[in-house]
């Protein structure tokens, strides 16, 4: 193990001892906010320190086994113990590398999922509907709640644009790699010649902010318009102006919300989406400034980038970022996304490990 890594782990070990002392202090237990902060830190570093102490014990065991090598009667046993100990060290070191990876502070958050039809006209809108169904089914499998915030339905079905809130622990960690361009290749139902058409949609996954107040939005920088909500082709027309459109002048971001039961609820939802988009824009700008040349393609979340192709005639889905092709398009589009999501997460983790190795 690299000296820099050992030094970092030793510091964490000392910190855990300090936290244990603090947690037994009445001054800490009587201060609820401080107590929660300390218990959270304690929970975060305990598994790391436990692995490090197991690593140190394995080193001791290897030294004791090597000391027995000089004894002819114990030599074979000592060799076996030494090899087993070295394998254990390797396994623990790999586990420690993963535990030390920087955690995304947004991983546990709820998300706003935005899907917009792109090139391809009606077929693109239908594909947007298929994507929303896929994510909704996946969310159901996870036990998450899906709530449509705003939907602009197409007259042939599907959506020109749909925004949904997905509530569930770890929603962002699972779906954050879905941001980008999604392309579909299939024969439309209206195609009489059997020709394959290509259409596209863009997906954006935004972590929900804790409070709208966490993002600075100057009231003078926004315009709020109200209008009558309607479904596809003017269906379900409300008699009151309950739909809300918010325009944020500094960023040019426009948010519409019309699926709530009242103007008040629509405005609250629209402000939440606006805050999430502004926050995401700020994070994108910060990352752009500090991005290194080997910035992870998976983690970039560039919405203009084509990330995946859904080829229906061949029954395949290809994720271009990791060159993964799966011939199970029906299962995946019905929400069986685990293999795809886990592969993306594993690649991202490998990329972070490579970065950690360079930093060390």
From Swiss-Prot:
How is this chain modified after translation? Methylated by PrmC. Methylation increases the termination efficiency of RF1.
Q: Identify the main location.
A: cytoplasm
* Residues with the N5-methylglutamine modification: 235
A single Gene Ontology molecular function, please? translation release factor activity, codon specific
Question: Coiled coil located at which positions?
Answer: none
Name the Gene3D superfamilies on file. Answer: 3.30.160.20, 3.30.70.1660, 6.10.140.1950
Give a Pfam family name. Answer: RF-1
Q: Where in the cell is it found?
A: Cytoplasm
Q: Write down the NCBIfam families for this protein, in alphabetical order.
A: prfA, PRK00591.1
Q: Which family does it belong to?
A: Belongs to the prokaryotic/mitochondrial release factor family.
What does the record give as the function of this protein?
Answer: Peptide chain release factor 1 directs the termination of translation in response to the peptide chain termination codons UAG and UAA.
Kindly provide the name given to this protein in its UniProt entry.
Peptide chain release factor 1
Q: Which organism is it from?
A: Methylobacillus flagellatus (strain ATCC 51484 / DSM 6875 / VKM B-1610 / KT)
